[in-house]
């Protein structure tokens, strides 16, 4: 299941906790996305998990059986043809991790909504994730009706009808529903066929400035590494425009918080691209699509533990402005997304909101709210262009709940 082709599209795997998203990634890519030790303990994806999968086609077989992820077709004893490599973003389904899901949605070109046939539709996070796709405007969607091997035909049919009813009037209306069993790897060919037709590779402009949304950052050095062997910090995320080459100089904004003369301010960080990893291989150049790792000259102490997640990277001087306060046009949902689903009240001055812009999540305090706009002072600044979409979450009880979408003025 290996491939040296760069991924060209990012596909989100979204849906309720334990509905089988991570198992599905494993069936498609042979990789398990839960790499985080805490995730192994809790059995849920906490940070975004990434895995690449290469879709292939057997030249001798009829469709849809021809679609596969295997390099060799045993039935016809021939090597399969490469179609394209895609990156899967496995977004957490646990409700307290909604912010992570939203920041992941910023780099998705399409999504597979995984819904288990063993439970009534919709479950709370299924609804929440679909609202997030709606808000961010992701409408290339395929629905995987998973675990059909665990129910009888009548129950599977009831579940299918519930799914159709649930997606009516949303971005997923009309999306194909593919019955699968990720655990048994059944109907994976049908799922690949649906993804190939519903989630095309977007057209990209290679001549624009490189722009990378940083979703993760790491220190890859093992404890006890000697000074001579120390590797620079690594950024993980997605290139959304232009192309990036090894040895390019890049700037990260908003950068780092620096204390000078008793005052703290945010300063951009500049570094050199030391290495590029895409599709599991080291490459000299990356273009948009897929998820990439960028080895840098940064001190690993400032990249460890996702400390630079939410930054934007690109050639120095080319990035959008950094905002410590901003005004946004607000479009509220009618009801709070989640299991209790009360009505959404207007935003009021002084209330705290959790805002997700691109891959950045920050808390802001509303300094002024009137009609369909509000001004917000941010705890952590964000780098974002005018017109950027903002997912707005409000504290309801002990949790942050999605209540609407903002557009940056």
UniProtKB/Swiss-Prot annotation:
Per its UniProt record, the required cofactor names are: Mg(2+)
Q: Which family does it belong to?
A: Belongs to the TRAFAC class translation factor GTPase superfamily. Classic translation factor GTPase family. EIF2G subfamily.
What Gene3D superfamilies would the database entry show? P-loop containing nucleotide triphosphate hydrolases, Translation factors
A Gene Ontology cellular component where this protein is annotated is: cytosol
Question: What's the Enzyme Commission number for this chain?
Answer: 3.6.5.3
> What is this protein's record name?
Translation initiation factor 2 subunit gamma
What residue spans carry the region label G2? Answer: 43-47
Where is Mg(2+) 2 bound in this sequence? 18, 43
The ranges of region (G5) come to: 181-183
One molecular function GO term is:
GTPase activity
Q: Where is this region: G1?
A: 15-22
Q: Where does Mg(2+) 1 bind?
A: 22, 45
Which HAMAP family does the entry mention? eIF_2_gamma
Q: How does it assemble?
A: Heterotrimer composed of an alpha, a beta and a gamma chain.
**What is the annotated role of this protein in its UniProt record?**
eIF-2 functions in the early steps of protein synthesis by forming a ternary complex with GTP and initiator tRNA.
Q: Where is this region: G4?
A: 146-149
Secretion signal span: none
Name the domain of life this protein comes from. Archaea
Native species: Haloarcula marismortui (strain ATCC 43049 / DSM 3752 / JCM 8966 / VKM B-1809)
tr-type G domain residues: 6-203
UniProt xrefs under PANTHER family: EUKARYOTIC TRANSLATION INITIATION FACTOR 2 SUBUNIT 3 FAMILY MEMBER, EUKARYOTIC TRANSLATION INITIATION FACTOR 2 SUBUNIT 3-RELATED
Record-annotated residues binding GTP? 18-23, 146-149, 181-183
User: Which InterPro entries does the UniProt entry name for this protein?
Assistant: eIF2G (IPR050543), eIF2g_C (IPR015256), eIF2g_GTP-bd (IPR044128), P-loop_NTPase (IPR027417), Small_GTP-bd (IPR005225), T_Tr_GTP-bd_dom (IPR000795), TIF2_gsu (IPR022424), Transl_B-barrel_sf (IPR009000)
**Keyword flag Transport:** no
GO BP term, example: formation of translation preinitiation complex
What is catalyzed by this enzyme?
GTP + H2O = GDP + phosphate + H(+)
